C-alpha cells in the first residue's frame, strides 16, 4: 500500500480572490521540491484567474502561464521533474464579494485528530 501525502497551497489575488488547492503525492520530500512549489502556486493562481467548475475541468484547461500546455500536462511535467506522482485532489475558490465559496462539493474534510492519526500510522 502506498502512503499518500497531502499539501495545501494558497493563493490570494489583490485580497479579493482566495484559493486553497490540495495536492496529493507519494513522497514526503515532494512538498519541499522547488519545482513542485512553483507549479502548485501557479495552479492556484490559474484557479483564481479562470474559476474552473471542478478538478476535471481544471485539468483540461489551457494552462494560464503557457497555453501550449494544459494544466494536466504541466502537472505531468512537474511530476517527472520531482520524480513523484502529483495530483490535484480538490480546491476551493473564494471571492470576497460573495457570501458563498465557489467550489466543487468534495467529501467533508476529516477531523484534524483523525487526519493526524492516519499520517502518524503511515
What is each model feature region?
Residues 1-122:
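N-terminal assembly/interaction segments in proteins that build large macromolecular machines
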